[in-house]
């Protein structure tokens, strides 16, 4: 499976937003773009550049490459409702994202690895595709041989209950989670403007 293999910290500095827990700590120390002129004043940003930056934020935040991201957009357009809202809701339903939201991994990259290595079951069936779309009522749990892994236990212990969203019910003791409902856009607090992404793709 193709995925981004560069430095997410450098990308975070370039975009001016933390795209991972590690990048968040780094940005606190170096809140400017990388490179020789990173601390210099930036000129006026064009409308296209703003739209492109928002798309990059979403892609890197969720770990999605261009082809798949564009497919999400096409699917969002075909659905009823606001295209931007549809786009966010689709991406939030990804299994790797739900695993991260549930606190089973400290980052989406870590969650993606758990899924890819076949550690998880959805409704009792093994699923190793990070982009698998979870539906309301789905039960996500670890395979018997994968339960109580140190990395997962540590992540759950570190994840505050306040971080776990209302649309996911987590049983920490048994390392299970139920996807209760598709979240509304207003409930998703992420540093991007999906409407600018829609404007970019609709040109």
UniProtKB/Swiss-Prot annotation:
The keyword Ribonucleoprotein applies. Residues 93-154 form the S4 RNA-binding domain. PROSITE patterns: RIBOSOMAL_S4, S4. One of its GO terms (molecular function) is structural constituent of ribosome. InterPro entries: Ribosomal_uS4, Ribosomal_uS4_bac-type, Ribosomal_uS4_CS, Ribosomal_uS4_N, S4_RNA-bd, S4_RNA-bd_sf. GO terms for cellular component: small ribosomal subunit. This is Small ribosomal subunit protein uS4. The lineage of its organism: Bacteria, Pseudomonadati, Chlorobiota, Chlorobiia, Chlorobiales.
């Amino acid at each position: 499976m193709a995925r981004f293999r560069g430095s997410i910290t450098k990308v975070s500095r370039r975009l001016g937003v933390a795209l991972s827990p590690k990048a968040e700590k780094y940005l606190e120390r170096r809140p400017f773009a990388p490179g020789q002129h990173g601390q210099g004043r930036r000129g006026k940003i064009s409308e296209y550049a703003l739209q492109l930056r928002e798309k990059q934020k979403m892609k890197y935040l969720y770990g999605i490459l261009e082809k798949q991201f564009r497919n999400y957009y096409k699917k969002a357009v075909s659905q009823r409702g606001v295209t931007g809202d549809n786009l966010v809701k689709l991406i939030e339903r990804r299994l790797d994202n739900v695993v991260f939201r549930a606190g089973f991994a400290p980052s989406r990259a870590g969650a993606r690895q758990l899924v890819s290595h076949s550690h998880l079951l959805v409704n009792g069936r093994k699923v190793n595709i990070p982009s698998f779309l979870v539906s309301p009522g789905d039960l996500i749990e670890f395979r018997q041989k994968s339960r109580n892994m140190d990395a997962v236990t540590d992540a759950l212990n570190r994840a505050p209950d306040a971080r776990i969203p209302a649309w996911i019910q987590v049983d920490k003791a048994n390392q299970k989670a139920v996807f209760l409902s598709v979240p509304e856009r207003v409930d998703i607090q992420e540093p991007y403007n999906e409407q600018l992404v829609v404007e970019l793709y609709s040109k």
